[in-house]
Amino acid sequence: MSEFRSGFVCFVGRPNTGKSTLTNALVGTKVAITSNRPQTTRHTIRGIVHRDEFQIILVDTPGLHRPRTLLGQRLNDLVKTTYSEVDVIGLCIPADEAIGPGDRWIHEQIRAVAPRTTLVVIVTKIDKVPKDRVAAQLMAVSELIGPDAEIVPVSATTGEQLDVLTDVLAGKLPPGPAFYPDGELTDEPEETLMAELIREAALEGVRDELPHSLAVVIDEVSPREDRDDLIDVHAILYVERDSQKGIVIGKGGARLREVGTAARLQIEKLLGTKVYLDLRVKIAKNWQRDPKQLGRLGF
């Protein structure tokens, strides 16, 4: 690559295929929420990969799925808009699961919505299976996509093949100047990142019914009046039902304290200063199906 290249890449795939982990590994810092719960990414977060010869802007999308709620429909619409606006689509398929109807459906969606966009298939999580399983998956992917498919196996966890993937993606971008200054790693507002970090901490280790029902809104961020090394962050966690409120708070508030501690440490890393984090839990009944409430909660 002689001339500088820059452009937009989005990782797509069914929920839980390692897209957010891959984004964070390539950027080198945490810009996308990771959780072993499907459907945990809700905003298209742009992570930025800087090199001397290129700049890749990674757009992280929610996993495509057949929607059951208005929120699900809005997330899918967001994904489809993203498909048609990027330079390269990276379809993520995990090495440790057989290709299924979900992968086929997503491939069809990509080709229907963005038939001309360059497609690279990324076989993720190769550290989780033996080499022969990886080889078998590469063959299966080739059968799904076609013999001309560009396929790159990677592990975001160990870093294996990430440099190869970066070069492949960069090689497919158009020549052009950098979109963002060197050193900038995301264009997400700090408040959005803070809300996502709190949401990630709250989702850790909880039962399946909660992830889709949890939204976090940053209510207020202000420097502490008598101390210049402390920032007060007030946030509200919204759930849909009383029973979910109990799950988030835990017995005697123990669970909410754990969430607060985990999130505070991540937010302190993000802001580079000490943080006092105040969390409150409120009920917003059936917010996923209510257009007014979706708007109020930032969707």
Swiss-Prot record:
Which HAMAP family does the UniProt record give?
GTPase_Era (MF_00367)
> Region labeled G5 — which residues?
154-156
User: What segment(s) does the record annotate as region G3?
Assistant: 60-63
Q: What does this protein do?
A: Exhibits GTPase activity. Binds RNA but is probably not involved in ribosome assembly in mycobacteria.
Residue ranges of domain KH type-2 in the record: 206-285
**Region G2, annotated ranges:** 39-43
**Classification via PANTHER family:** GTPASE ERA, GTPASE ERA, MITOCHONDRIAL
Keywords per UniProt? Cell wall, GTP-binding, Nucleotide-binding, RNA-binding, Secreted
Q: Where is the Era-type G domain?
A: 5-175
Q: Name the gene for this chain.
A: era
According to UniProt, the name of this protein is GTPase Era
Task: Quote any Pfam family the record assigns.
Answer: KH_2
> GO: which molecular function terms?
GTP binding; GTPase activity; ribosomal small subunit binding; rRNA binding
**An example Gene Ontology cellular component term from the record?**
cell envelope
